C-alpha cells in the first residue's frame, strides 16, 4: 500500500498465530449440513483457506494456481458442491478478501490497484491469448470493487523496488522467479531516469517461461518421494510382473492440490488391489496413508523444506511423518544430495537459461553491458539458478533482497510513478 507520504506499507495476514506479509492465492470451500438437513457451503481465501483445509477432518475443495489458467479459453470455471463458478468469480473472491483486509489494516477505502502480471501467462502461445488473460484478470478486480485497475510486469515492478536503492543509473536485468513462471526484463533505472521521466525505450525487452518453483518441487516428488511410495514397484498379475500402481496416480502427487482428486472409490480399489499384489506392499501402504489422509499440503511442505535446505548445504534428509486416525502412520526419511536435485532440474535450468539468451539477443545487449542482475522470488535462492547468472555476469553483479515482497513493493512505486507522485 502506498501511503500518503510516499512510503510503502505491506498488508499482514494472520496464519497459524503469526502475522505474515504474503498471501497465497488459494481458495477452500467446505460444506456442512444444517439441523434442518439443508446443505450449506462456505469459502475461505489466502492463509485462512489453508488453515481451514488443514483443520478439516472431512476435506472440502481446495483450489489454487488460478492465474495459471487465465489464458485458456476452454477453462471457463469449475463446479463446487453442485454450483458452477466462473474462473473470474473465483479470482474475484480472493481479490475481494485482499481488498477488505487492506481497508481494515490501513483504515481507508482501497479503490485503485496496480496489479502484477507475468511477462507471459502460463499456457499463452500468442499475444492474443496473453491479452485475454489480462482481460479476465481485470474483470475480476473490477468485480471486487476496484474502480481503477492498471497492470505492471512483475519483473519491472521488482526493478522499481531495486531502483529505490540506487544513487546512479544502471542497466539491469531483473529475474523474477515465482511459483509458476520465471520472468525476465532488461531496463534502465536510476535517479536520473526518474527525474527526466521514464521513456518506452528504457525497457529494452522482456521474456518469460512457464516454469519455476512448482516445477522444481514436482521433480523432487517424482525422483525422490514417489519411488518411496511405490512408483517403481512391481506387482504380480497372473504370470506377469507389471507396475504395481498406474503412473497417473503419482502424477497427481506432484501437485499438492491435485491429491484430493485421488480420494475416490475407484482409486481406493486400485490401491487396495495393488497392495495385495505388490512385491513391496509397505510402499503402497504408505501411499494409501497419504491419499486417505489427504496429506498433499503437508507432503509438499516437507518437499519445500528439503529444497530450502539444499540451498544451504550439499546434503540433507527429506523427512515426512504423519499419523492419521484409523490409518497406519507414515514416516519417510530419505537422504538427498544437492547434486542429485540439480540433475533432476537440468532441463528446467536449460529452459531458463535459453530465455535469458533470447532476451539478450533480441535486445542487442552483451552480458558485459549489464550493470546489475537483480534476482527475486523464492526460487532465486536455489544455487543452480544463481549459477546461471554468476557464470554469465560474474558474482559481483548479482544482487537480491526482499525476495518475497520486492514485487509488491515495486507495484506500489509503479503506481506512484504512474500517478505523477514522484
Predicted segments — roles?
Residues 180-185, 408:
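Short glycine/serine/threonine-rich phosphate/pyrophosphate-binding segments
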Residues 1-3, 25-28, 183-187:
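Short beta-strand scaffold segments in enzyme catalytic cores
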Residues 1-19, 49-174, 188-210, 215, ...:
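N-terminal phosphate-binding loop and flanking beta/alpha elements of the actin-like ATPase fold
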